[in-house]
């Protein structure tokens, strides 16, 4: 059985707490992930949100988008609203051939209410 390894960018910077690696450039994250032997990386806050920008950036470091995270707030929004909001990310993931998306309900968490 073959295994493909991917990593999350939280190993370099934390989207929820920017004081933890917020000054680390995306290019450093991608370079070091590639140098460490990973072929995939999750999306993160520093990643371009348009496929025409993201795909060349990933290709530059010989990486693929392997997954990513979507934080839904189903306490405040309806499921129909969340389905509308996630569409841009789904298109990006489809364009990048990402095999999965992590759907998380963030109500009451630092992601859903950082204050």
Residue spans of the language-model regions?
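Active-site groove signature of glycoside hydrolases
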Residues: 93-115
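N-terminal pre-domain/capping segments
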Residues: 1-100
């Amino acid at each position: 059985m073959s295994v493909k390894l991917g990593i999350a960018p939280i190993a370099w910077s934390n989207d929820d707490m920017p004081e933890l690696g917020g000054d680390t450039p995306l290019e450093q994250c991608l370079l070091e992930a590639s140098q460490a032997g990973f072929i995939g990386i999750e999306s993160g806050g520093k990643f371009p949100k348009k496929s025409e920008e993201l795909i060349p950036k990933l290709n530059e470091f010989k990486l693929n988008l392997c997954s990513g995270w979507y934080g839904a707030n189903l306490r405040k929004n309806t499921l129909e609203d969340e389905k509308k909001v996630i569409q841009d990310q789904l298109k990006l993931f489809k364009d990048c051939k990402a095999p999965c998306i992590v759907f998380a309900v963030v109500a009451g968490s630092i992601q859903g209410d950082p204050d």
